[in-house]
Every structure is written in C-alpha cells, then in structure tokens.
Amino acid sequence: MTTDTTGRAGNPAAAASPDRFRYGFLKGNPQLTKNGELKHLLSIEGLPRSIVNHILDTAEQFVSVTDREVKKVPLLRGKSVFNLFFENSTRTRTTFEIAATRLSADVLNLNINASSTSKGESLLDTINNLSAMHADLFVVRHASSGAPYLIAEHCAPHVHVINAGDGRHAHPTQGLLDMYTIRHYKRDFTKLRVAIVGDILHSRVARSDIHALTTLGVPEVRAIGPRTLLPGGLEQMGVKVFHNLDEGLKGVDVIIMLRLQNERMSGALLPSAQEYFKTWGLTPERLALAAPDAIVMHPGPMNRGVEIDSQVADGPQSVILNQVTFGIAVRMAVMGIVAGNSD
C-alpha cells in the first residue's frame, strides 16, 4: 500500500517523499505543541535532547511494571488506542498492544486487509472516520515515507499519532528503545563508539538510530556496509563510513546489526546470502575486534547465518532479547507522554 499526495492508494513511484512531509505543508516541528511538548512522535530528527531524555527517564519508571504481579497502571484508562498497521508486523504491533494494555487503554487492531482502504477508500477518509469514533491515539505503520505526517496533519485535534515505521524514513520508537538499551548498559553516551552494520540504505531503524545517537552526544557513529547498501550523505550527518567490516569494528562499544531488507530492494544489489555472511556477517572472531565489553544489538527480525552468527546472537555480549523487553517500557513511555499533551 502506498499513497500519493492526496492519501489515495497509488503507484510506489508517486509516493510522497519524506522531505515533502517534513518541510512541505508542515511548518515548525509538527510533533510539538505550542508549548514545546510532545504531541506526536513522528521522527527522532528535530527532537531536542531534553525530550529524548525525558522519554528514556520515563521508560525507566515503567520497566519495573514488567516485574509486578499485576502489570498495569491506570495512566491511559478511558483512552482508545488504534493500531493501524498498513505493513505486516509481529514484534512492533505486539509490543505496542502490550504497552497500551499495561497503561489500561482500550486497544483496537485494525484489520487492514478487511478494511475500507483495501476497497478503495483513501487513507485520509479512513483516518477521518476513525477519528469520528473518538480514537485518542493512532499507532501507524505504513509503506510510504511520510504517511504518519499526513495523518498527524489531518486527524482530529485531540488525536495523537505515533509513527511505528514509515517506508525507509523513520522508526522512532525502535530508535528510542535502542537508546534505552545502550544507556542501560553503557550509561554515558559521550564516551561511546557505535557501529551500525549492514543494509543501511533501506533501514528506517538506522536513520532513527543515527539521529538519536547524535542528539545524545555520541562522539563517533560508524556506518559499515557494502557500497551498494550505504546511502549518500552519511558523512554530512557526522557518520564515519567503512567498507571493511574488520576495520569498522575495531574498538567499538556498541554494534547494531541490520538485516538485509530484500523486500525493499529493486535490483541485484548483493551476491548470495552465503557470500554476504562471509564478508559482512558478525562472527565471534569479528566480535573480538570490538571493545571487550561491547554489546551486540539487532532490531529484528534476525537472519542467522546471514548478518549474524548464532554464537554471537546467543552469546554473553548479545542484548537482543533485552531490547524487546525494554521496547515495551519505551512504548509505554511514549504513549503516556503524548497522550498527556495537547495544544
């Protein structure tokens, strides 16, 4: 499903670019209220460090909820959260549903395949109808970059929008849970060297992580991957680019591995998965090039034997499953914060 500038189902080539949605019809920062509080979470880009830290601090308070016998707090009691996933997702949709339920919200998961959008209704008409049902918060995943911005501009004033991933553009809650994970294990962002490895070209997670890391003051962010899978402009963002995995991993404190997003590739950008693993897969031998206490992360889904060896994924330096656990607390924090702010 893609949208043109009117929000109707359309040709992928006609889908609006992220820049249009960030800088076209929206002025200022569309995520913030007039008082500078977070009303929507659409992207980490442009958020002040104070808001990012506020989200991480709030998430820390929610982590303990997971260990309680009754895993609920009444923060969103009486609120309705609509999960609108126009792209398939298991992990993200499930963690948002768990997070909303633990905040005592009423949760609706829209069945996109059976919805009016699959029958030709425009995206904006769908959003307007759902707003009329007195939804309080939309969690949106969409194949078109910028779709959550379009929804945030046109939904009812009382509705809040959280971007759960839009095209190649952004995945802000994944970026935030990655930052929470790093902070949990490393504490001081200003002394870290962080490597992001793999298919950065097609990764909305990589973009969100880069913006979050630079916002939080990480002095050295490295992008490591084959030339065909690295976007232009990384150096302008302050990122060091490496085309050799062994060189790029030397001395890093955090390694974020990315899967190959074959569904977003339009041509033969790489050889076989086996050849990719030989050159770009994270093995125990390559992990040894990093700092002795380096942590290994992955946003999932993980392809063992392609971008990461099972010994690394299941090893003592892997914090991949903890990312999932922390993700619930981070998404609770985001929903709780945005739902409490309005113009």
Curated annotation (Swiss-Prot):
**What Enzyme Commission number(s) appear in the record?**
2.1.3.2
What are its GO biological-process terms? 'de novo' pyrimidine nucleobase biosynthetic process; 'de novo' UMP biosynthetic process; amino acid metabolic process
A GO cellular component annotation here is: cytosol
Q: Among its keywords, does the record have Transferase? A: yes
The residues that hold carbamoyl phosphate are R91, T92, R141, H171, Q174, G300, P301
Entry's Pfam families? Answer: OTCace, OTCace_N
The reaction(s) catalysed by this protein are:
carbamoyl phosphate + L-aspartate = N-carbamoyl-L-aspartate + phosphate + H(+)
Q: Which domain of life is it from?
A: Bacteria
UniProt keyword annotation of Transferase present: yes
Q: Which UniProt keywords apply?
A: Pyrimidine biosynthesis, Transferase
Q: Which residues bind L-aspartate?
A: K119, R204, R259
The record, for Gene3D superfamilies, names: Aspartate/ornithine carbamoyltransferase (3.40.50.1370)
Which GO molecular-function terms appear in the entry? amino acid binding; aspartate carbamoyltransferase activity
Q: In which pathway does it act?
A: Pyrimidine metabolism; UMP biosynthesis via de novo pathway; (S)-dihydroorotate from bicarbonate: step 2/3
InterPro entries linked to this entry: Asp/Orn_carbamoyltranf_P-bd, Asp/Orn_carbamoylTrfase, Asp/Orn_carbamoylTrfase_sf, Asp_carbamoyltransf, Asp_carbamoyltransf_Asp/Orn-bd
* Family the entry assigns: Belongs to the aspartate/ornithine carbamoyltransferase superfamily. ATCase family.
Q: What does this protein do?
A: Catalyzes the condensation of carbamoyl phosphate and aspartate to form carbamoyl aspartate and inorganic phosphate, the committed step in the de novo pyrimidine nucleotide biosynthesis pathway.
Q: Could you give the subunit structure recorded for this chain?
A: Heterododecamer (2C3:3R2) of six catalytic PyrB chains organized as two trimers (C3), and six regulatory PyrI chains organized as three dimers (R2).
Q: Which PANTHER family match?
A: ASPARTATE CARBAMOYLTRANSFERASE, ORNITHINE CARBAMOYLTRANSFERASE, MITOCHONDRIAL
Protein's recorded name = Aspartate carbamoyltransferase catalytic subunit
